[in-house]
Design a protein with these regions (language model features):
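C-terminal or mid-to-C-terminal helical accessory/interaction module adjacent to the motor/catalytic core
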Residues: 149-174
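Conserved DEDDh/DEDDy metal-dependent 3′-5′ exonuclease domain
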Residues: 37-149, 156
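Short, solvent-exposed beta-strand-terminating loops
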Residues: 26-42
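Short polybasic amphipathic segments
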Residues: 19-21, 51-52
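Short beta-strand elements in bilobed, periplasmic/extracellular small-molecule ligand-binding domains
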Residues: 31, 49-60, 166-173
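Flexible loop/turn segments at secondary-structure boundaries
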Residues: 3-6, 28, 94-98
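Entry/capping segment at the start of metal-dependent catalytic domains
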Residues: 1-20
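A generic structural motif
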Residues: 22-24, 159
Length: 174
């Protein structure tokens, strides 16, 4: 849920309203707590098609709506993450994963359900079976393609390195 300020992941004050998973099979799977009608889903698919046309890639859009945040987070961990071999993202470790784990704790969901052996490791409580790679950390330390880094926002870096910005979504997921 979006508020006027950027939320502190250790406190996770606002509900998670959507999660996007991009698979190796080029599927953009969106889990959300607000339903999107077919017209909006079709519009999103068209935006995805247009966005990736310049690099010759095609991705499919799959949408799954849940009645509440608890059901969405539980399904994400117990169904999706449990099958992952790898989790990646931009600022994924310090923000996304920490926020999800802390929201789960507030809702009474044990993060270890994401692991086939019901175990997590480290201060971030990653499932034991999953490799984790944060692209922001890798870029900040190893990137040599951009001499002067304006900032570390995903939009800025994507444009500078590969010429692609984030897909703009004009609607709301609240």
């Amino acid at each position: 849920e979006v508020t006027d300020s950027f939320p502190e992941p250790s406190k996770a004050p606002n509900p998670v309203t959507a999660i996007c998973i991009v698979t190796p099979e080029k599927q953009c799977i969106v889990l959300a707590t607000k339903n999107l009608d077919r017209k909006i889903q079709s519009k999103i698919q068209k935006q995805i098609d247009e966005h990736f046309k310049s690099i010759g890639e095609e991705f499919s859009f799959i949408f799954k709506c849940f009645d509440n945040e608890y059901d969405m987070l539980y399904t994400f961990l117990a169904t999706f993450v449990k099958k992952f071999s790898m989790m990646t993202g931009w600022n994924f470790v310090q923000f996304d994963w920490q926020y999800i784990v802390n929201r789960c704790k507030k809702l009474g969901i044990d993060p270890s359900i994401a692991s086939p052996i019901a175990r997590t490791f480290g201060k971030h409580e990653f499932p034991c079976h999953v490799g984790v790679m944060d692209y922001l950390d890798i870029y900040a330390k190893w990137d040599k393609t951009v001499d002067i880094k304006e900032d570390f926002k995903l939009d800025t870096v994507g444009e500078a390195v590969v010429g692609i910005r984030k897909i703009k979504y004009e609607g709301t997921i609240q």
